[in-house]
Regions:
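An amphipathic alpha-helix signature
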Residues: 114-122, 141, 145, 222-233, ...
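Post-cleavage N-terminal segment of exported redox proteins
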Residues: 2-67, 106-182, 258
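Gly/Gly-Pro-rich "capping" loops immediately C-terminal to redox-active cysteine motifs
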Residues: 44, 70-118, 202-237
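Repeat-solenoid scaffold signature
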Residues: 238-250, 257, 263
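Sequence/structural segment immediately N-terminal to covalent heme-attachment motifs in c-type
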Residues: 50-88, 165, 169-207, 225-228
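A cross-kingdom marker for long, charged
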Residues: 259-273
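Acidic helix/loop microenvironments that form the catalytic cleft of cell-wall polysaccharide enzymes
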Residues: 82-85, 147-148, 250-259
Length: 273
C-alpha cells in the first residue's frame, strides 16, 4: 500500500495545540539536562517488501487519522496525529517521533505502570483524539508503532527512566503556571492565532480546532497549561515561532479555559481484540 502524503496545509494544521500525543512530549527542566537532541538522519527510504508497506500505512494513518478508513472509527474529533506531532512526527521541536521507539518500554506515572510504545500510542486515541482505544495488535496499532520505530532507526536503545519521553523531547518552560493570565492570552489569541484557528476555536480550513467538541478532551496532555505552553513556544506561530514564555503560557491558559469534552476513562476504553 502506498502512502498518501498530506499537503503542506494539512501538516501546517499541526498547530501543536492539539494533544500530546505519543511519547515525545515535553519534559521538566530537571529532566531536560539528560535529554538532548541527537543528530541522527531522518530515514527516507522505506524498508523493502511487506514491512515497508506497513511503515507507509502507519505514516498515512498518522497524517490522516480522523479520516483514514482504518483509524477514523477510533477518533472522536477532527484532529490527526500530525495536528500535534508536526510533519508526521519528523519535526524535532514539535512533539517529535524521532527516536521515540528507543525509549520504550518505560514506566508511565499517569498509568502507574510500565507501558510499551504501542500502549502509549493507543492511549492517545482516548485523550488527544477524544475517541476510543484501538485494540492492542490491531492493524492501526501495529502500523503506527511500525512507523514510529522506522523513525527511530539509528538511535541507541535506552529506556527512559523519567517516563514516556523520547530523546528529542523539548524541556518544559521554566515559568510558574500560576502566573498565567488568561485575559491577556485572549488578547494574544485574537492577534496571533485567530486567523488559523478561528474566533470560536473551531479551526479554519485545514487548521485544527483548539477547543470545542472537535478538539482534545480534558484528559489530554495539552489540557495542562504548562505542557501546551511549551508546545506553543516551540512551534507557534507556525513557521515563525516567536512567543515569549509568558505569552505562550497566557495563550495556553486562555485556550484551556474554553469548553472542551470532559474525559471519563471508562467511556474511552473501547473493546479488547
Amino acid at each position: 500500500m502506498k502512502s498518501n502524503p498530506t499537503s503542506k496545509a494539512v501538516l501546517a494544521s499541526a498547530m501543536g495545540l492539539a494533544l500530546i500525543v505519543v511519547a515525545a512530549g515535553a519534559v521538566s527542566a530537571q529532566e531536560a539536562g539528560a535529554v538532548k537532541s541527537m543528530a541522527v538522519p531522518i530515514p527516507t527510504e522505506l524498508p523493502p517488501g511487506e514491512l515497508g508497506k506497513v511503515v507507509a500505512l502507519g505514516r498515512d494513518i498518522v497524517n490522516n487519522t480522523s479520516t483514514h478508513p482504518l483509524s477514523r472509527q477510533y477518533v472522536g474529533n477532527s484532529l490527526n496525529c500530525t495536528s500535534c506531532h508536526l510533519d508526521g512526527g519528523t519535526n524535532p521541536k514539535a512533539l517529535s517521533f524521532l527516536g521515540v521507539a528507543s525509549a520504550y518500554p518505560t514506566f508511565a506515572p499517569r498509568e502507574k505502570q510500565t507501558i510499551t510504545l504501542e500502549d502509549r500510542n493507543l492511549n492517545c486515541f482516548m485523550r488527544s483524539m477524544n475517541g476510543v482505544r484501538p485494540p492492542n495488535g490491531s492493524e492501526v496499532s501495529v502500523a503506527i508503532a511500525t512507523y514510529i520505530t522506522w523513525l527511530s532507526e539509528g538511535y541507541p536503545v535506552k529506556m527512559s527512566l523519567k517516563g514516556p519521553f523520547g530523546p528529542n523531547s523539548q524541556p518544559s518552560l521554566k515559568i510558574d503556571p500560576a502566573t498565567a493570565d488568561a485575559a491577556h492570552g485572549k488578547t494574544l489569541y485574537a492577534s496571533t492565532c485567530v486567523s488559523c484557528h478561528g474566533s470560536d476555536g473551531a479551526g479554519v480550513g485545514k487548521f485544527p480546532p483548539v477547543w470545542g467538541p472537535k478538539s482534545y478532551n480534558s484528559g489530554a496532555g495539552l489540557s495542562q497549561n504548562l505542557k501546551l505552553a511549551t508546545v506553543l513556544k516551540n512551534t507557534m506561530p507556525l513557521g515563525n515561532p516567536n512567543l515569549s514564555d509568558k505569552d505562550a503560557l497566557d495563550i495556553a491558559a486562555y485556550v484551556n479555559a474554553q469548553p472542551r469534552p470532559r474525559f471519563v476513562l471508562r467511556e474511552h476504553l473501547g473493546k479488547s481484540k
